[in-house]
UniProtKB/Swiss-Prot annotation:
Signal peptide as annotated in the record: 1-22
Any one GO molecular function term: metal ion binding
The name this protein goes by in its record: A.superbus venom factor 1
Family: Belongs to the venom complement C3 homolog family.
Organism: Austrelaps superbus
Note: Interestingly, a peptide (from position 1111 to position 1125) coming from the pre-pro-protein has been identified by MS/MS, suggesting a longer gamma-chain in AVF-1 than in CVF.
UniProt subcellular location: Secreted
Maturation and modification: First processed by the removal of 4 Arg residues by furin-type protease, forming two chains, alpha and gamma/beta precursor, linked by a disulfide bond. This mature AVF is composed of three chains: alpha, gamma and beta.
Lineage: Eukaryota, Metazoa, Chordata, Craniata, Vertebrata
Stretches assigned to the NTR domain: 1507-1650
Region (Factor H binding site): 1197-1260
Complex formation: Heterotrimer of alpha, beta and gamma chains; disulfide-linked. Is active with factor B in the presence of factor D.
Amino acid sequence: MEGMALYLVAALLIGFPGSSHGALYTLITPGVLRTDTEEQILVEAHGDSVPKQAVISIHDFPRRQKTLFQTRVDMNPAGGMLVTPTIKIPAKELNKESRQNQYVVVKVSGLPLELEKVVLLSYQSGFVFIQTDKGIYTPGSPVRYRVFSMDYNMHRMDKTVIVEFQTPEGVVVSSNPVNPSSVLIRPYNLPELVSFGTWKAVAKYEHSPEESYTAYFDVREYVLPSFEVRLQPSDKFLYIDGNKNFHVSITARYLYGKKVEGVAFVLFGVKIDDAKKSIPDSLTRIPIIDGDGEAILKRDTLRSRFQNLNELVGHTLYASVTVMTESGSDMVVTEQSGIHIVTSPYQIYFTKTPKYFKPGMPYELTVYVTNPDGSPAANVPVVSEAIRSEGTTLSDGTAKLILNTPLNTQSLPITVRTNHRDLPSERQATKSMTATAYQTQGGSGNYLHVAITSAEIKAGDNLPVNFNVRGNANSLNQIKYFTYLILTKGKIFKVGRQPKGEGQNLVTMNLRITPDLIPAFRFVAYYQVGNNEIVADSVWVDVKDTCMGTLVVKGASSRDNRIQKPGAAMKIKLEGDPGARVGLVAVDKAVYVLNDKYKISQAKIWDTIEKSDFGCTAGGGQNNLGVFEDAGLALTTSTNLNTKQRSVATCPQPTNRRRRSSVLLLDSKANKAAQFQDQNLRKCCEDGMHENPMGYTCEKRAKYIQEGDACKAAFLECCRYIKGIRDENQRESELFLARSDFEDELFGEDNIISRSDFPESWLWLTEDLKEPPNSQGISSKTLSFYLRDSITTWEVLAVSIAPTKGICVAEPYEITVMKDFFIDLRVPYSVVKNEQVEIRAVLYNYADEDIYVRVELLYNPAFCSASTEGQRYRVQVPVKALSSWAVPFVIVPLEQGLHDVEVKASVRGELASDGVRKKLKVVPEGERKNIVTVIELDPSVKGVDGTQEQTVIANKLDDKVPETEIETKISVLGDPVAQIIENSIDGSKLNHLIITPSGCGEQNMITMTPSVIATYYLDATGQWENLGVDRRTEAVKQIMKGYAQQMVYKKADHSYAAFPNRASSSWLTAYVVKVFAMAAKIVKDIKHEIICGGVKWLILNRQQPDGVFKENAPVIHGEMLGGTKGAEPEVSLTAFILTALLESRSVCNEHINILDSSINKAIDYLLKKYEKLQRPYTTALTAYALAAAERLNDDRVLMAASTGRDRWEEHNARTHNIEGTSYALLALLKMKKFAEAGPVVKWLIDQKYYGGTYGQTQATVMVFQALAEYEIQIPTHKDLNLDISINLPEREVPLRYSINYGNALVARTAETKLNEDFTVSASGDGKATMTILTVYNAQLREDANVCNKFHLDVSVENAQLNSKQAKGAKDTLRLKICTRYLGEVDSTMTIIDVSMLTGFLADAEDLTRLSKGVDRYISKFEIDNNMVQKGTVVIYLDKVSHSEVECLHFKIHKHFEVGFIQPGSVKVYSYYNLDEQCTKFYHPDKGTGLLNKICHGNICRCAEESCSLLNQQKKIDLQLRIQKACAPNVDYVYKTKLLQIEEKDGNDIYVMDVLEVIKGGTDRNPQAKARQYVSQRKCQEALNLKLNNDYLIWGLSSDLWPRKNDISYLITKNTWIERWPNEDECQDEEFQNLCDDFAQLSNTLTIFGCPT
């Protein structure tokens, strides 16, 4: 019998011939094949001269069930028996949903030997890029974008692209399909409620979303600057051993090219890790003259801050520079960072050097030398030691050194050092590596060295390529030619042969460099020796990055290249490739001052494209196969030379390495400190001489010192010394103030047309170059347009995509726009309603003569300003030639929203004039608060009858600022069911299961089963790469061997037994059916007759009328039965055989008519028994059989039999438990109970069971079958199909969203201004999350902040006259914060969070002194000087005393004018317990004169008039009062008495008793109790209301503020208030007429009402 088995095996394996020794057949493909892309492969027959037709076919892996592509090619001697067929793999035929790597089989037949190679697959079929019009945006603005798409041949591809916009938190807020050819791509509009930070626009192909391209842009609030500042350090590093000072040149230019006059404030510092340590003594004021200045960091200054400079090595120096214009109207802050502090100024890398060398042949060592900041270091001499070779780096930092290697060595130690003449030897940079010898095949000693020595290679060059060979003479004489492949962008671009003559050891060929080879290519060459050896080498070649085609933007004529006037007409000319599509945009260069990181460039395009190279080294390889692998190729030959299987498409990415005290006081300090020789004591002395912001005495300061008595003594001595000098200076100090202004009358300016169109980007056009090309093959097109109104330089950026020449980014074309006289109106991003602010109109005169200018601020009722409806505000100022003058205007915004600020100016005696109108954003008062509500939508759990309905209750906003909007944003996101466990069992652990079957009919199945189930599992999970894709072929061979051997034990009736003469076994026959049915899914050669014959035998011979199956001949190897051999045997056997019948159903249904009836009888039997079963194992097995037959959907009985709902256990039976639990998992998957399946999978994986053979057969089969089914079903389980309806109160039609698996992560958003209840309903399957964000402005409430565990006092006062004032500051105050912890011990790690007054910044120097020195009061501090909103200071304290009050003082400087300042706040809290906190507010008292200092002309009175004024005018008569009281919208007229004045929440509350209702209004019963009249505190003086006085008062209906059961009255500018004399005063002659008028007014309106 065994002889018969071997014969059958031999017959089945006859299709596997042995190797032919007559020729060497080779197949080479790219290491990764891309779908839907034409790819070139190579098939070669070396040593064969017989013409052949080869069949190239591509099949799916691992099952090879589909032929994805097939072609035939003729191989003949005329073509060198070499063919390069083109293949294309259609993505639609493959499973793109798989999370695993996918492979295809490339097969070559028609040769004497078939060639096969399994190759990794990629679905990325091209490149896609996004261009946004800018790199930075403000909330609410549109983001314009366009898409460029091309294939790997750089051909334009108008394939649909999905564009997603993602917030900084990664939430997808928009996802839309876009056709790159469309010129009407709708911009994405940023919402007003938007996340600040870096956003992403992500583009990916619709049918291959795993690869994407991302464009970034920032979103924040900003105002464009009027000039840019560039910093240029003298060196890119700070050499620690040097003695030179460090210089930084400062260049400041207006955006229209003129030079800035002003001042720069420069502060140097060192960044140590992530902490910035400034050098306070380096703070200097540098004049900017003619746009230039220079800052110097002296070595002594650096040493004064850091005594041991060697400790700074490895850290970086930075220079922070603030440049302010002469007029003070604009300020730009910039920083030069990343200046490395080094002992050696260079670093050496071997990033472009091959790791392998050929002994006895030249070795090209490419070294890359960088500056410490990672930039290339040019002109640096380098030298290699041992094998000496010298060179000098080029502009890209590289130098090539040729090393002549010795013959007999296997490793080559290499050390390269810089050889700079100005550096001592110990400071030269060095780098070492060891190159390894190339291993020849079989130790033959045959080598090939490909050399390309040109330094810089560009398109159009003819490149000499040298082929050097070395080996024994016999081998070399066999070489007739070299075969070479050129790869670029991951594709085989060209294949060729270079002949070699006999005796030639060096062959040179010329290679023409075409644009297709940009940005780099790989040159791979090999030759064959005999018919079994391949000798190979490769080299990576960089090509200069340029456009493959042409694109130029220029002025259409010489006139267009000149400086232009705003609004002028001009033309530009485009020159490019015929048929190219050109995208244009003009961007204000001020945008790039704020952010130029994200601008599209040709370099970025090539950087992305270069990543498509599948090669991962600089060339060469460990051996012949390594050469192909490292170049990104896959190779197989007829002699079983095979490259390793690739498992990732990309290469590992290397780290990217690119890119005022007086002089006398200072002298006194220096002299005093010099008296201490000890460095530590000198530090104590210096700290003692630093000014203490809190004003502590020297003695109190000394209490904080912990460095010992000697330090304390030095500190006290120096502290007292400097105090004496300061006191003397104080007595001599004086303060001088000066002011002048004038008025003049000039002509009107109504004819001046104001400039108002100031876009940040425009000219967003797409143009096709359809014009006939010229003699150079270039098409051109002229565009006409009108310039916008900005005085700036526009940068016109053009990006083209040509039909066959890829993407080209043109050099930007600049258009400078200016005129000799103009206004620059500097408007902040936003101002707060009712906060008085100063804006500046800067007048620029670039003429050669002085001028006099009249400036006019136009009236706008939305502001209170010096311009009124009846009289415009004008001022005349002189402006010197080639200079500027700032005219300040103070305004009070009275209404929210966007409002025009317009300024006009005309030059006296000339026609020159200008006008500017800009929008000013006015935001509401109060503190912006967010309320977030999250609702989970899960209708299957939370719904009734499948629908979840929920009412969202409106938020209670009792603290909302009146007359402000509420913004509510509703966002819905689906919750896709994620896969619980990926790669449940590691495929690499299954090697032991692929074994050779053997033995009797039972043993053969025991040993065949592991190969079947391992292959089944690895196919399902896509894990062959973990085990080795070549092992699948071996596994299939073992399966077929087991199949052939089992035929020996098949009886004529298709039943099976251990031996042919033994009675047939029901269980064994069913098991053979089950395993063969599984194997039929793996290989095609298992015949259906074999499977179905066993099924028919079971039905006809072993099934009883009631459906049960009987066993008449149990198996010999009882261990192979698994758990079925226990109790409840009939149910177990019937369920087991039923599963086998169901497995075979797809194969046998057409061949066995009674199969369905047999299955139904077994089902009926099992259904009767199911609920009564006792064993967990039998319950699980039966549940699986019934669920597989689709007759069980209820999992309650199954789960009741489990232990912990994740396993089905019986005592002391591990493998049976694994088997039974696997059946249960299969049952749950068949019932679609995916949530319940998760814990079961986790339990199975935790068992770390990798299967076996004897005694473990059923556990092995079932665990891998179950986990494979889990892997198959979970990715396709997309049980998310929700319909959501949101009924918002202001919408007639509900918002309806449909959420499924494909769009789950795209947020659906809606916004409403109402704060009302609304309903949401959800139905369907799955979950979603609805987030409701409500944003509103809350009143500042001091009493709402109850202090817990902290006492806190906050106050502000005027700074002392001798206090140092920050440069550019308009005023200086001192902030005093005193706190004490109210616990039993000191509070550790306490934080003080200070919200600054608007317009004020904290004094960093004061805070630095508090945090430095031996008498350290604070641990550290952080300043956020955000001028758009209020700045903040966060102070960290190591402790706060519980026994005494501790105070901090520091100065705050006013940098811009703000009137009616909102209160600032100070919060102290414990880091470890946030409930322990206290908040207090602070505000400068008007008595300090702060308000008066911002007055300009009569603006102060106007600012006060924004409140209601107490009407004391004598010219008011009865008729005027009646007219005003009866005006439209006047709601009420009362006579009141003022009972009480309260201060609350920053407002004044006037409590009034309504004595008489003269005209009734909204308030139904105003006399029921006293009424509250609310006024802003700023209006107190203007109103001047007195207690117990009577008043005539009326107001508008819009000024009523409904409360819970009451009404408050707002006092606004529309409120009429007059004092009503009392009865005694009415007797005086002075008040008689007034009292009569009031009485008559009351009678008229009460009796007759208002006249109609």
